[in-house]
Amino acid sequence: MSGFNDRYSHLLSKARQAMRFGRCAWAVQSTGEQVAVALVLNRADWLDELGYTLAEAIERAGQEWVAMIPQVARQLAESR
C-alpha cells in the first residue's frame, strides 16, 4: 500500500505545483506526469498541446494513475 501512497503523493504534488504556478511548472514534468496532471486539472488544452486526445491520455496515464485522478482532483478542490 505504501507504493500507492507514494504515487498518490507524487501525483498530488505535481498537480498542486501546476495548479499554483501554471503552465511553466507543468511544462518541466515528464510526459507521463504532464498527461496525468492535465487530466487532474481538466486541462484539455494542455493535452492537445501534447498531441493527446482525452482517450489517448487516459490510455497513456494507465489504470493505476487514472484511478487516483478523481481523488486527487477532489483533494485539490478542497484545499483551495
Each predicted region: which residue ranges?
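Charged, low-complexity intrinsically disordered segments and flexible loops
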Residues: 1-37, 41-80
